[in-house]
């Protein structure tokens, strides 16, 4: 059973909580935290699951087994999560985003590094660096859904592309991505990509609709 908070006030409890109004709390540990209203955590929080349908701001770190964001989430510190499912807008201003698995059909922005074993994105990602084992980013053209969130948050300067300085993983598949460097074993550079440099040690496929400045490494080029 969830402890439900509505209206304005300060949340001072742990456990299972649901927020429907405007609530501020100092941080703490939760089993499950659901945000349907406007919620601000003044400190770091730990939760088994964090479900955001409203607007959530954390002024510290966030650590959870599961993050499900259908609303707008801003994290001033670091984000550590086993699985993140992002259909809304999530912005992380700390040094690092760490996850086992990230699924992004919305918008994910990170001020610095995203580190995840698996990243599957049909939305948009903006970060300085992404490292992992398997990275799939298929960002291509704006939709009405994304445009709405981008107007609210201005999460990306160019919403037609995901923009990452460095992408490094064993397996990489990209579409609609701008990157300075892409390093990996097996790489697919799809249409609407603009990549300055690709370092590939396995197989490499480059779509005719992509722009790649330089290719280095021992890659086997395939069509």
Predicted regions and their residues:
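Extended beta-solenoid/beta-helix repeat architectures
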Residues: 1-223
């Amino acid at each position: 059973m969830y402890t439900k908070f509505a209206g304005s006030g300060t949340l001072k409890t742990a456990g299972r909580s649901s927020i429907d109004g405007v609530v501020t709390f100092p941080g703490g540990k939760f089993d499950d935290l659901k945000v349907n209203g406007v919620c601000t955590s003044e400190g770091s929080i730990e939760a088994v699951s964090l479900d955001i349908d409203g607007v959530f701001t954390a002024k510290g770190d966030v650590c959870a087994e599961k993050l499900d964001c259908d609303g707008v989430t801003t994290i001033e510190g670091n984000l550590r999560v086993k699985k993140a499912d992002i259909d809304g807008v999530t912005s992380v201003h700390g040094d690092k985003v760490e996850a086992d698995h990230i699924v992004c059909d919305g918008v994910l922005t990170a001020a610095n590094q995203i580190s995840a074993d698996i990243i599957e994105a049909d939305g948009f990602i903006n970060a300085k660096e992404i490292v992992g084992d398997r990275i799939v980013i298929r960002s291509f053209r704006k939709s009405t859904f994304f445009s709405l969130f981008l107007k609210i948050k201005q999460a990306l300067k160019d919403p037609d592309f995901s923009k990452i300085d460095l992408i490094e993983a064993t397996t990489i598949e990209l579409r609609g991505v701008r990157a300075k460097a892409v390093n990996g074993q097996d790489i697919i550079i799809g249409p609407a990509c603009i990549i300055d440099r690709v370092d590939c040690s396995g197989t490499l496929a480059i779509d005719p609709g992509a722009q790649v400045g330089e290719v280095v490494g021992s890659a086997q080029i395939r069509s």
